[in-house]
Every structure is written in C-alpha cells, then in structure tokens.
Amino acid sequence: MNETITYDTWNDMLSKQITDQLIDELDVLKWAYRTYGEKIVYACSFGAEGMVLLDLISKINKNAHIIFLDTGLHFQETYELIETVKERYPGFAIQMLEPELSLTEQGTKYGGELWKHNPNLCCQLRKIEPLKKHLSGMTAWISGLRRDQSPTRKHIQYVNLDQKFELIKICPLIHWTWDDVWTYIRLHNLPYNKLHDQHYPSIGCEMCTLPSPDPNDERAGRWAGREKTECGLHQE
C-alpha cells in the first residue's frame, strides 16, 4: 500500500481505499509513519488513550516526534507523568509547546482568569495557536480520538481531512472502547495519570477539569457547568 494522501491531494475515494486496507491500530501506525516519515507528529495529552498510543508507537518508531500542549495550567500529576514517560521511552523526542503569551501577559491583555470568563479564547491562545504554528511544517498528525468518547466524535475515521489545520489527521484508536484502553494499560503495566483513579476520565487544564459526575460520559468533567465540551482542536 503505497498511496500517499495529503490535504492538497485529498479525495474521498482514495481515503476510503486506504482505510479499507488498514486492519487495526498497528497497521494504521505502520502505514502512517511509512507514508509521512518526519512529516508526522503525535499530539499527546498524556491521558489514558495517550499512554496506549505511546506504547503502540514505540513498537513502530522508537524515535517518534511527540508534542504536548503545555498551557501552564495542567495538573502536577500530568507533568510528573510526562517525566515518567521520558524515562520509559528514552528515544521519543517529546517537545513541550508553550503559548506565545505567559499567563501574566495573557492576564494583562485579556483580564485575569480568562478560562472563567472566556474559555474559548483561553483555549485558542494556549492550545490551538501553538499547535497550529507547529503543525504548519507537518503533513499529518496523530490523535487518540475514539468514536465512543462523545457524540461529536462518532464519525471519525482512521484517516481524516483536518480542515482546521489543513493536513491529514490519523486516528488509530477509533474502534477502541474505554474498557479496551484500560485493559491494554493493565495488561502492559503502563504508567498513567493517577487522577484517573480519582474519577477523572478526561484530564485537561486544572482550572477546567473536575471529576466526572457521569460514569457513562467520559468528558462530563471538562468545562463543567458550561456548554463548552471541546477545546477546539478537533472542531472544524
């Protein structure tokens, strides 16, 4: 399977042909790294799916380029997990992407605690813009999205056209369930964020993440009390 598909050459027929030939998550990753080489990056949040994907990627590319959107607002447990991952997978090139504005500069320009009065702008400044800048030099990126995570993600494919960042988005875990993720973590004794043991299924910035009140909704604790359910990275 030698087909190469990019944002500029995308067509639905070719993407379907490629997807139909991909058997499972490892097959997806093998194809992705073979096809895009140094022009593909994994944007990892270091959540449960992230730990699975990191381990799978290590079987395909031990020197993979990994990025983390360091908003400066993450839980201490998240930063500690990243250090653990660096020790477990020393070949990975893990890059911390920081926003252009420090929290102090952001507060001066837009008002303090922006995440409270304008969470969309806060995500734009501290997540979307740094990622967009980094991805401008890439052809494809890998994401840990799963179809059963939320209604907004139920139609994702292995290979997707990303209109927001104008590249190809690869999602190897689309068919995995939450139970599948944790079965893999336990089977392979993978490290994970200890907040998961405190009813945090989805973990983002500390100010915008609470324990989930609904065990059937993994993202119920994100931006609790607001209509917002996504940071915007995966919305067109």
Swiss-Prot record:
Example GO BP: sulfate assimilation, phosphoadenylyl sulfate reduction by phosphoadenylyl-sulfate reductase (thioredoxin)
Cofactor(s) required for function per UniProt: [4Fe-4S] cluster
Disulfide bridge map: none
Subcellular localization, as worded in the UniProt entry: Cytoplasm
Cofactor binding description: Binds 1 [4Fe-4S] cluster per subunit.
Domain of life of the native organism: Bacteria
Reaction(s) this enzyme catalyzes, per UniProt: [thioredoxin]-disulfide + sulfite + AMP + 2 H(+) = adenosine 5'-phosphosulfate + [thioredoxin]-dithiol
Family matches, as CDD domains: PAPS_reductase (cd23945)
Catalytic residue list: 231 (nucleophile)
Family, as annotated: Belongs to the PAPS reductase family. CysH subfamily.
Protein's name according to its UniProt entry: Adenosine 5'-phosphosulfate reductase 2
Organism the protein comes from: Bacillus subtilis (strain 168)
Primary gene name: cysH1
